[in-house]
Amino acid sequence: MSKFIVIEGLEGAGKSSAVRYVADYLHGHGVARIECTREPGGTPLAERMRAIVKEVHDERLTIEAELLLMYASRVQLVETRIKPALADGIWVVGDRHDLSSQAYQGGGRGIDANLIGAIKRAVLGDFKPDLTLYLDIDPAIGLQRARHRGELDRIELEQLSFFERTRQRYLELAAADESIKVIDAGQAPEQVKAAIEAALAHYLKDEPSCIPG
């Protein structure tokens, strides 16, 4: 049975590299068909919504509009790419999913968790990842890494305190959900890769029927 695995984390945590690590590990363990996605974005329409969220505009984007754009982009991706792939036996590895909205818009922006939960239930129902790997990093270190990549986007331009609140919410959410595994992303890249592979090995051991044999 195909699975949906998600990588989460702050800016500079190494999510793109982690997506590759996961895909490579799965390929090495008999998973032939894997599709990688990102949020916001992942489809032509969802990418247009991503641009609105990420780019700096003359007009202020309200936090409520930001939240709704995130979920609009997300449900477009889920319904047009992720669910069809899973139904076709394709594993999906995602760079961000719903946990990002709970952490960024909920923790960082301070939007009420009940409102976010209501929107989530309305558009996603009970759909959720099978496994989430949260890459935990000191926000100051993550932002430093992001700056080294070049020009910052609208969200990356937020104050450090925003990312501290976001990280705190991530950790709270991880502590309450056993399907979310915390990976120390402040380690050297090879150590992060080893930790991700260990988490995958543990998950696949408990779900042996999902690996072709």
From Swiss-Prot:
Reaction(s) this enzyme catalyzes, per UniProt: dTMP + ATP = dTDP + ADP
Any one Pfam family match given in the protein's UniProt record, by short name: Thymidylate_kin
Keyword Kinase in record: yes
Residues involved in ATP binding: G9, L10, E11, G12, A13, G14, K15, S16
Coiled coil: none
SUPFAM superfamilies associated with the record: P-loop containing nucleoside triphosphate hydrolases
GO terms, biological process: dTDP biosynthetic process; dTTP biosynthetic process; dUDP biosynthetic process
Keywords for this protein: ATP-binding, Kinase, Nucleotide biosynthesis, Nucleotide-binding, Transferase
Keyword Transcription regulation tagged: no
Signal peptide extent: none
HAMAP family, per the entry: Thymidylate_kinase (MF_00165)
Family designation: Belongs to the thymidylate kinase family.
Protein function: Phosphorylation of dTMP to form dTDP in both de novo and salvage pathways of dTTP synthesis.
Protein name: Thymidylate kinase
Organism (species): Aeromonas hydrophila subsp. hydrophila (strain ATCC 7966 / DSM 30187 / BCRC 13018 / CCUG 14551 / JCM 1027 / KCTC 2358 / NCIMB 9240 / NCTC 8049)
